[in-house]
Amino acid sequence: GSVRKENIASIRSAIAQLDYRVDPIARSLKTRRSHSIGILLPSLAAPFFSSVFLASDKVLREHGYHSLMSCYYADHGLERDYLGYLISAGVDGLIYVPENLTAEEFQELTAHRDVPVVQVDRMIPGVDSDIVLSENKRSACLAVSRLIDRGHRRIALVGGPSSVQTAK
């Protein structure tokens, strides 16, 4: 609502005297926005995932959002628990690097929660969300071509486990 002009000074004085701080939880109950985005990663040990977090966090802060980050360490149960927690905590969106969940599990945890999700680096087949993927095959072909152009003939590929989408 509106505040009468003659009351503004006394309100500001009371705010300063009481060192009042906005309660983000109370605000989110009224506005239905938490100004927080969940970031769910398999690990921070790999430089790629650390860079996903750091870049996302920077952009979120620039736009007035806070990040809530969880790592599930390739553990199916933790991935499921953290996804459920972040959605239940009322995040306004989710940046998610999936690894173990099926479409059915994902739908069960996110059903009736209108939370936008961006899957990064991998995707759960059958889940309708925005997706950011690397062109790994194209990049590998370019790298091998460059090595061949420079005279290399004995070229090996060291990849991750075939169960991880980006290693296929």
Residue ranges and their predicted role:
Residues 1-35:
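N-terminal helix-turn-helix DNA-binding module of bacterial transcription factors
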Residues 13-17, 55-66, 84-90, 103-104, ...:
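Bacterial carbohydrate/catabolite-sensing allosteric modules
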Residues 22, 31-45, 63-65, 91, ...:
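Interdomain hinge and pocket-entrance segments immediately C-terminal to HTH DNA-binding domains
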Residues 25, 78-82, 104-106:
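Short acidic active-site motifs
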Residues 41-58:
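N-terminal winged-helix
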Residues 69-76, 161:
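Short beta->alpha junction loops
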Residues 73-76, 97-102:
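Short beta->alpha connector loops
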Residues 94:
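Intrinsically disordered, low-complexity polar regions and short flexible loop motifs
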